[in-house]
Amino acid sequence: MAFKAVFLAHAPDAEPEKHGCVIETSKYKLFVVVVKDQDQAVEVCKKLVKEEGIHSILLCPGFTHRDVAEIAEAVGENVAVAVARGDGPSSRVSMQVRKEQFAPKPSEAAC
């Protein structure tokens, strides 16, 4: 039996059905999925746990503590949920890039 894990990341233009892949060996099966928001994240996690028997969920640094808790509650105590956070300097670099890339452009901002 292979160990099954999913890595989830956020992007404002994500479509989980389209933006994902699976990497598989005889001992490890890794699902990678990009989601638009927390609602999609919860639904994707619940679906993969039910349909694929996921053992571990790894979340990108953009997930908040509340997001992590909500996902952990949704998938149950038999699934590990962790966040890929680095040290202080690494986290700041990641946060700055996400702010620059994901912030609405002036032309995209609501009137």
Specify the residue positions occupied by each region the protein language model found.
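Glycine-rich phosphate-binding "P-loop"
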Residues: 22-39
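N-terminal basic/disordered segments at the start of proteins
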Residues: 1-17
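A polyampholytic, Gly/Pro-enriched intrinsically disordered region
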Residues: 54-55, 100-111
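Short, charged, surface-exposed secondary-structure boundary motifs
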Residues: 89-96
